[in-house]
C-alpha cells in the first residue's frame, strides 16, 4: 500500500511542478492569427514599510513602449525622508534602469516578450513608511505584424487615411492621459503636504499657547510670593 501511495505522490508532485514551471504569457493560436497586443495601464497607491521593498511584474510583448512613473505622496512614522529607489528588470532578470528621488520615471522600449519586473525600495527610511502613487503600463504605437501589414495593403486610400487619423488621435489621448496622471500625482502630493503643514501649525500653536499660559501662572505665583508680607503677632515678631 505504501509504495502505491508514494508513487501517486510523485505523480502529483510532478504535475504541480510542471504546472508551476509553465509560462503564463499569451500564445497565438496559429501562424495566421496575430499575437495579442494589449495596452495594460495601471495607476494606484501603495504603502511601503520602513526599509521594505515592493515589486510588480508587467507582461509586455516585443516592440512595445514601457512607461513607469512614481511619486511619494506622504510619509508616516518618525522619519520624514521621502526618497525612494526604483528599478526595472527585463524578463531575463537584467537591470534596465534605475531612478531615485521623491518622484521619477523609467521609460524604455521592450526588446523581448515576457514579464518585466518593477521594484520600489524604501531603503533610505528605516523609521517611517511612505505612500507612493504608481502609474505604469505598456503601449504599442500601432500594428507591426505581417498580418496587419497585409491587411493594410487591401484597404483603399480613404480607409487608410481614416485609420492613420484614428491612430494619431489614440496616441494623443494616451499621452494626455499620462499628463493627467502626472497632474493627479502632483495634486495628491501637494494635498498631503498642505494637510501635514496644517496639522503641524495647529499642534505648534497649541503647544505655544499652553507654554504661555503655564509661564503666566508661574510668574503670578512667584510675584505673589515675592510680595507676600508675613503677619506679625505678639508672640511672633520679626527680628531686628
UniProtKB/Swiss-Prot annotation:
Residues 224-240 are cytoplasmic. One of its GO terms (cellular component) is Golgi apparatus. The keyword Membrane applies. SMART domains: EMP24_GP25L. Residues 22-200 are lumenal. InterPro entries: Emp24-like, GOLD_dom. Residues 53-138 form the GOLD domain. It comes from the Eukaryota. Keywords: Endoplasmic reticulum, Glycoprotein, Membrane, Signal, Transmembrane, Transmembrane helix. It is a single-pass type I membrane protein. Residues 1-21 form the signal peptide. It holds the Pfam family EMP24_GP25L. PROSITE patterns: GOLD. The chain crosses the membrane at residues 201-223. It is found in: Endoplasmic reticulum membrane. The keyword Signal applies. Glycans are attached at residues 107, 156. GO terms for biological process: endoplasmic reticulum to Golgi vesicle-mediated transport; Golgi organization; intracellular protein transport. Belongs to the EMP24/GP25L family. This is Transmembrane emp24 domain-containing protein 6. It comes from Homo sapiens (Human). The gene is TMED6.
